């Protein structure tokens, strides 16, 4: 049985068929939902931020709320710098367990000095601070680094706010590949083309993006250097070249090629050479994704009659089926901690994001939208970014793994699709 075009939710449709420039539009983050356990935190307006082009306190507040781990306490009208010790009694009465204060000061050379202090309101302790000297263009990045500092101090886990996402937009007859902050802001165009761009995939060190371009009137795989804008051809074999995914060590990719007839999964060396075929079926095998430890390659196949998710060893061999709930499951993504599988399942006529605990095999739908696609985990495994349609608009969303906290990153105009969350910055 062949896989229908909707298998891909765009990415797999290919089976059937310079440097960065500033974004033309910014995103707006809209957070909804209530988590079961959230730390109440007060984030005051930073002293001096009204004269700065970015409101640091607002960015930090949005970051922490979007994570699902924190509940912001009302600080309307409160301005406090890093040297101001909070009145513990007042903030305890307001329900805060922690507080962030800080300042933004312009320097003579045009840069800004950004400082913060984190306070434990319950214990009355100074939990430390940070300072950054940044160019105006990097003020948002400094805010995300503050969020990372606060998140790690209070949860013991590394924050993901200074990481990046890649995604594709379509406006009129133009396709754009974008690189943006984890909240969707600060987008920079990596590639513009009149032909489709699909399947962006970050390299493990965050320096490159593999993607599929149709500029040659067929799907071809490239690797794009994010810093320089230079790119190189990785796969232009006969037929379709699609769905690239990096190995955890960054030394090779796996991809779907139809060079030998049917769509099968191959390993591609970065320096060229003949690709190694990993699957040997008469069905469509596609959408490969490595497990973070490199022990498995997960992929989608219709070898059982309908699309399901399987896994195999990285050298190929006999695959084992992973998904058994639902008759149509696609778009596998494995969490960096190796515990979770995110995928899209067709439920009736709707495509809904599911999360499976791999140890138990228990799968749960976590969205109430009906056109979900392209899930990708944050590098700390706590959030998933995905594309969907909401209120008649294409949008990017993030969600916690339980689906309790969602944030919509909604841009102005155009379809927004194919997100991929980059690794921690090194």
Curated annotation (Swiss-Prot):
Protein's organism: Polaromonas sp. (strain JS666 / ATCC BAA-500)
Subunit structure: The Tol-Pal system is composed of five core proteins: the inner membrane proteins TolA, TolQ and TolR, the periplasmic protein TolB and the outer membrane protein Pal. They form a network linking the inner and outer membranes and the peptidoglycan layer.
Its job: Part of the Tol-Pal system, which plays a role in outer membrane invagination during cell division and is important for maintaining outer membrane integrity.
Record key words, sorted: Cell cycle, Cell division, Periplasm, Signal
Location in the cell: Periplasm
Family, per entry: Belongs to the TolB family.
GO cellular component entries: periplasmic space
Leader sequence residues: 1-25
Manganese among keywords: no
InterPro entries associated with the record: 6-blade_b-propeller_TolB-like, PD40, Tol-Pal_TolB, TolB_N
GO process terms (BP): cell division; protein import
Domain of life: Bacteria
Protein name according to UniProt: Tol-Pal system protein TolB
């Amino acid at each position: 049985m062949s896989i229908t075009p909707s298998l891909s939710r765009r990415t797999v449709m290919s089976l059937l068929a310079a440097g960065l420039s500033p974004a033309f539009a910014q995103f707006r983050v809209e957070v909804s939902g209530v988590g079961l356990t959230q730390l109440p935190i007060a984030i005051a307006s930073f002293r001096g931020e009204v004269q700065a082009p970015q409101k640091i306190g607002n960015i930090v507040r949005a970051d922490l709320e979007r994570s699902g781990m924190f509940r912001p306490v009302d600080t309307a009208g409160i301005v406090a710098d890093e040297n101001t010790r909070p009145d513990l009694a007042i903030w305890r009465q307001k329900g805060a367990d922690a507080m962030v204060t800080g300042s933004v000061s312009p320097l003579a050379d045009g840069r800004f000095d950004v400082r913060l202090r984190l306070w434990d309101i319950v214990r009355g302790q100074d939990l430390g601070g940070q300072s950054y000297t940044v160019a105006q263009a990097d003020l948002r990045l400094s805010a995300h680094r503050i969020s990372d500092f606060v998140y790690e101090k209070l949860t013991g886990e590394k924050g993901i706010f200074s990481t990046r996402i890649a995604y594709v937009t379509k406006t009129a007859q133009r396709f754009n590949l974008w690189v943006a902050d984890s909240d969707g802001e600060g987008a920079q165009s990596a590639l513009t083309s009149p032909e489709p761009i699909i399947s962006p995939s970050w390299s493990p060190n965050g320096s490159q993006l593999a993607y599929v371009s149709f500029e040659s009137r067929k799907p071809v795989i490239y690797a794009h250097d994010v810093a320089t804008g230079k790119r190189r051809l990785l796969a232009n074999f006969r037929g379709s070249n699609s769905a690239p995914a990096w190995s955890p060590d960054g030394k090779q990719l796996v991809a779907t090629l139809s060079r030998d007839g049917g769509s099968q999964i191959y390993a591609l060396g970065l320096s060229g050479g003949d690709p190694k075929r990993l699957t040997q079926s008469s069905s469509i095998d596609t959408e490969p994704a490595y497990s973070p430890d490199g022990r498995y390659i997960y992929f989608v196949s219709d070898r059982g009659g309908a699309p399901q998710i399987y896994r195999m060893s990285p050298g190929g061999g006999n695959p084992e089926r992973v998904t058994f709930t639902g008759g149509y499951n696609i778009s596998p993504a494995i969490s960096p901690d190796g515990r979770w599988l995110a995928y899209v399942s067709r439920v009736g006529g709707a495509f809904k994001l599911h999360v499976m605990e791999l140890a138990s095999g228990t799968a749960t739908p976590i969205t109430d939208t009906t056109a979900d696609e392209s899930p990708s985990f944050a590098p700390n495994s706590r959030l998933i970014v995905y594309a969907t349609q909401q209120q008649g608009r294409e949008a990017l969303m993030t969600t916690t793994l339980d689906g309790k906290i969602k944030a919509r990153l909604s841009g102005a105009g155009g379809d927004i699709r194919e997100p991929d969350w980059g690794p921690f910055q090194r």
